[in-house]
Amino acid sequence: MHGTVLPPLKKGWQATLDLRFHQAGGKTVLASAQHVGPLTVQRPFYPEEETCHLYLLHPPGGIVGGDELTISAHLAPGCHTLITMPGASKFYRSSGAQALVRQQLTLAPQATLEWLPQDAIFFPGANARLFTTFHLCASSRLLAWDLLCLGRPVIGETFSHGTLSNRLEVWVDDEPLLVERLQLQEGELSSVAERPWVGTLLCYPATDALLDGVRDALAPLGLYAGASLTDRLLTVRFLSDDNLICQRVMRDVWQFLRPHLTGKSPVLPRIWLT
C-alpha cells in the first residue's frame, strides 16, 4: 500500500477501530470489530437485506488536542457496506497539541463502500489533522463524502484562529487517482473563499452521463460548486454559507448516483431521520 507516513502523537485518547466485513449467507456481515479506547460501532442494521448499514461512534464529548484516532475498514470481495455516524464530529479548541484522525478504507474486488459521515465541526482554535485514504481495486465501487464546517456559522462564529490539515487520497490498484490537501491556518480562509462549509463527494467508477447529472444537482450552490471526471473518478467540490443547502445537495447527489453505481434505490440511514 502507498500513503503518507504520519508521526505518532502522545497524550489524549489513543483510540483505534478495525472493521472487517465478509460475505455470509448472501449478505454482508461485520465479521470483526476490534477497538481500543472510545471508538466503537452499533450493531449493524439491514434495511436492504444483504447490505450492511453501520453506525460509527466517535468519542463522547468531541475530539481535542492530543487525541489520536485510527479507523480502518476492510471489505472482502462482494461486500456492500454503508457507514455513517449519528452526529457531527466536533474538534474543540486546543492549547497547542494536535488532534489526529487517520481513516483507511480498503475494498477488495467487487466490494462496494458508501462512506457517509456526518459533518466535522472545527471550533476556533482547533488544531487538527485528518488523513483519509481509500484503497480500491478496479472493480470496487465507492460513494463517499467529506463535509467540513469551519467555526459555528449558525451563531456567527468563524474559524478565526487555529490550524486544519485535511488530506484525502484515492488509490486504485495501487495507483493514485486523487491526492489533495486542504491547509488552513490562523483564520486565513481565502483558499475556501471565506466560506465556512467545505464539501467533497467522490464516486467511482463513473461516466460522463453521471457527471452531467451531478452538475445539474449542484445548481442550488451556484458558482461555488463543480464536478470533474478523471480516470472514472467523479469528484464533486463545493463551498457554501448554508449548512442546510450543503446537506440537501450532498444527499441529492448521493440519491442520484446510488442507483447507477449499485443498482439499488436510495435507502436513507434511519439515524438521519431522527
Swiss-Prot record:
Which terms does the record give in the GO molecular function aspect? nickel cation binding
Which Pfam families does the UniProt record give? UreD (PF01774)
Q: Which GO terms describe its cellular component?
A: cytoplasm
Superkingdom of origin organism: Bacteria
- The reply to whether Chaperone figures as a keyword in the UniProt entry is yes
Compartments annotated for it: namely: Cytoplasm
**Which InterPro entries does this chain map to?**
UreD
Record's keyword annotation contains Chaperone: yes
Give the principal location in a single coarse category: cytoplasm
Key words, A-Z: Chaperone, Cytoplasm, Nickel insertion
| Family listed | Belongs to the UreD family.
Which PANTHER family does this one have? UREASE ACCESSORY PROTEIN D (PTHR33643:SF1)
Subunit and interaction comment: UreD, UreF and UreG form a complex that acts as a GTP-hydrolysis-dependent molecular chaperone, activating the urease apoprotein by helping to assemble the nickel containing metallocenter of UreC. The UreE protein probably delivers the nickel.
Q: What is the role of this chain?
A: Required for maturation of urease via the functional incorporation of the urease nickel metallocenter.
| HAMAP family, per database record | UreD
The protein's name in its UniProt record: Urease accessory protein UreD
Q: Which organism is it from?
A: Klebsiella pneumoniae subsp. pneumoniae (strain ATCC 700721 / MGH 78578)
